[in-house]
């Protein structure tokens, strides 16, 4: 199976998943969700040697399976922990490529503005520390990707932040956002990140 075919399969699974979610077919939606990242892993293996990216997508798959259980409780905690490991592997891969540290520092300083707003919004809520720690990790990865100067990767991490913000708002019961919106952002985020990394 060539790489273009694999990408078409990914897009097909994505469309099918979003359709199942929008129609309320929970089991089929859960099933197609856990097929997404393994499909991108096949694409990566066709592209070359990317062990860190494969590890990242493996933990993303674990996170997807755990978050099928919802945005509360121990499954949610371990799901987000798995995503944190995913981001760490992404970050290590970025560092192995080399970044512009000036761009990285500028991006990090800029991202501290929304981070401070997040702290003011949820800082006093019970269990806020884990959300704030996760957000810091995500913003650090976003800063590194800015230093990498890959437009695809930057677009990908922005969509990842949007998706995770939706999940966080739902988990904290601040605002419920449709699962299709959250997953649509996430599906495109992971695709853009993988395409960005393999284009470097």
Describe the residue ranges of each PLM region.
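Polytopic alpha-helical membrane-helix bundles and their juxtamembrane interface segments
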Residues: 1-200
